[in-house]
Amino acid sequence: MDTKGCTTTNSPSTPCQNCSRITNVSTISSNNGCHPGGLTVNNCQPAGHVLRIPWDQGCQPTPRFCRKPIYLMNNFNARFSLDDCSWYGEGINSNEKETMQILNERLANYLQKVRMLERENAELESKIQEESNKELPVLCPDYLSYYTTIEELQQKILCTKAENSRLVSQIDNTKLTADDLRAKYEAEVSLRQLVESDANGLKQILNVLTLGKADLEAQVQSLKEELLCLKNNHKEEINSLQCQLGERLDIEVTAAPSADLNQVLQEMRCQYEPIMETNRKDVEQWFNTQIEELNQQVVTSSQQQQCCQKEIIELRRSVNTLEVELQAQHRMRDSQECILTETEARYTALLTQIQSLIDNLEAQLAEIRCALERQNQEYEILLDVKSRLECEITTYRSLLESSDGKRPCYPRATKCEPSPWTSCKSGAIESTAPACTSSSPCSLKEHCSACGPLSRILVKICTITKEIKDGKVISSYEHVQPCFIIRPAKV
């Protein structure tokens, strides 16, 4: 606070602007003017000093006590100066009623201010409560309707998942049956191919046998033709010999009787038929043994093939079941991952909401703490003001008790020097501002020549309030108030 000229204030109690580091500047002052008693006294009087003005012995007006103002200034040093002027005042009035009335008025003003601050505090608390009640439903919306729809959708999803699993199981069963039928078909095809291969082998053997039979028949036919040729040749030779010899020679040949060729052939047939039968039986036996071996091999191979096919079918079934289980596990994993992502998103949203709620509550708590600290500081300041007022009351009471009636006025000039008080906890400096006390001309019936002419000086009180934060001036407020000083004129 910068002061220019006379730094007294005649305005009533008005708090200055609230700022972050400057608390309220409270001013408690009395009304302008003094009580009637022959002198008109201004309220600009230095605190703690009694100013007297010289009078003639014949002119002794009744002195009146003038109320002094109290200024509460926070974080400012008050400096008071007047252009090298000596102030003259009057003596102390010992009227106890007027003094007590003044003190009662000041105490009533103080109590009125305390009640006003309490009302403001209650209004602020009610506003804070209303704001918190208003913000609660916004921060905590009702999701019950959404929960019901979510539950219905989850039930539908579960039903569709069950239906899908049932259809998948049916598809798997049909695939398994199709695989079984395909395996049976392949087995039948393989058996058919084996039978066809066996029939082809038998056909080849039959062809070989038919070829052998044809060869034998050709040999028999050739032998028959040779036999006929031999017979014909023999007949021709006999005929030729008979023709050469004629009928002259009778040659008797005692030869063995000619064998019957049919009989010989029959005998040969009888000899060869058992051999052929034995050979045929051997061949048939060999063929049957080969066929039995082949059949046994076919049966064993078919059994092995069936076993292998059964194993393959079982392995395919196990593979299909494992694939179905794997797909089910994959679907379950995907569903669990989707549920996990949904839950993470939901809980992250909830966490963000809760974090925002916590931040809002922390901000509100910080504001409430700041308000409480500010109110605590104001309360401490008011308590300090109360203690100062009590001290002043005690000093006034002691002064009233020490004064025994009216005292004579002793002329004395006093320099305006402020007497500062000690600072309170919040850094506010409480000082009694200087008040310039002067008297109007003597109001007695007989004018006193010793009073002399009086002059009125107009002094402007300029009060500048600055709000400083981080070494920078944020806002500034200037209040100018005029003040009249009455002093004897120079002759």
From Swiss-Prot:
It comes from the Eukaryota. Residues 404-491 are annotated as: Tail. The keyword Transferase does not apply. Keywords: Coiled coil, Intermediate filament, Keratin. SMART domains: Filament. Residues 96-407 form the IF rod domain. Residues 244-259 are annotated as: Linker 12. Expressed in skin and scalp. In the hair follicle, it is present in the upper hair cuticle and the upper cortex. Also present in the in the upper portion of beard hairs (at protein level). May play a role in late hair differentiation. There are two types of cytoskeletal and microfibrillar keratin, I (acidic) and II (neutral to basic) (40-55 and 56-70 kDa, respectively). Belongs to the intermediate filament family. This is Keratin, type I cytoskeletal 39. It comes from Homo sapiens (Human). The lineage of its organism: Eukaryota, Metazoa, Chordata, Craniata, Vertebrata.
